[in-house]
């Protein structure tokens, strides 16, 4: 027994790894990975496989995700066209808004441009039509003025209803004036001044005998009213174009429901 112990001590002394400079090689590293046996134990019978329901749910999600990605990354042609037209509309409206603020390039002409827009406002037109109706002494004149008043009231209600429904803001942060609040012309789409100018100009061209220069000036006035609303930053270009279309449609509607002279006289006498 003592002989075997002495032989074991001799082997330990002759072992190179038992020297002081190699003792660190025999010690396991701190914070190192666990031995493989622990990994085999973790993957043993005690580990439970995921339930079958989760796997089916993940497969369904993986099948749905590529379709959603394709829908987002490949929009339809209508969506691309609509977004492109909207971007062009905003860019043109920003460029044409040269009187939108005090720091704009045409800020000195803002008052004159706003004055042109006021000529297409509903309050002056309704007030002027009522005044002319009171002063008129002919049945034909009263008939035309009563139908014009009907067209103006129809325009205000139509524009206010569509603006309240869509609620589109203008290209610049401009607050509506007091006259705009009175006629409920608060939002941008459609442009109420443009629809009114188009409707009134078409009405006058159809029911008044005017010389050719006056007809040309009437059309130019309607175009200038619409352009002035874009220049002060109140409306987009598409708002004004839509206003022109709505004004023409309103004129056609008034022509369909035109009140005869007898109806106009009855309304005037009741008033």
From Swiss-Prot:
Keywords: Endoplasmic reticulum, Membrane, Nucleus, Phosphoprotein, Transmembrane, Transmembrane helix
Residues where Phosphoserine is found: 43, 62
Gene3D superfamilies (alphabetical): Phosphatidic acid phosphatase type 2/haloperoxidase
Region: Disordered, residue numbers: 1-66
Cytoplasmic side: 1-112, 163-202, 261-271
InterPro entries tied to this protein: P_Acid_Pase_2/haloperoxi_sf (IPR036938), P_Acid_Pase_2/haloperoxidase (IPR000326)
Topological domain spans for side Extracellular: 134-141, 224-239
Bilayer topology annotation: Multi-pass membrane protein
Region of interest (Interaction with MTOR), residue spans: 70-91
SMART domains listed in its UniProt record: acidPPc
Pfam families: PAP2
Highest taxon listed in the record's lineage: Eukaryota
MF terms in GO: sphingosine-1-phosphate phosphatase activity
A Gene Ontology BP annotation from the UniProt entry: negative regulation of myotube differentiation
TM spans (from-to): 113-133, 142-162, 203-223, 240-260
GO cellular component entries: endoplasmic reticulum membrane; membrane; nuclear envelope
Subcellular location: Nucleus envelope; Endoplasmic reticulum membrane; Membrane
Record family assignment: Belongs to the PA-phosphatase related phosphoesterase family.
Subunit structure and binding partners: Homo and heterooligomer. Interacts with MTOR; controls MTOR-dependent IGF2 expression during myoblast differentiation.
Function, as annotated: Plays a role as negative regulator of myoblast differentiation, in part through effects on MTOR signaling. Has no detectable enzymatic activity.
Protein's UniProt name: Inactive phospholipid phosphatase 7
Organism, as annotated: Homo sapiens
Gene that this sequence comes from: PLPP7
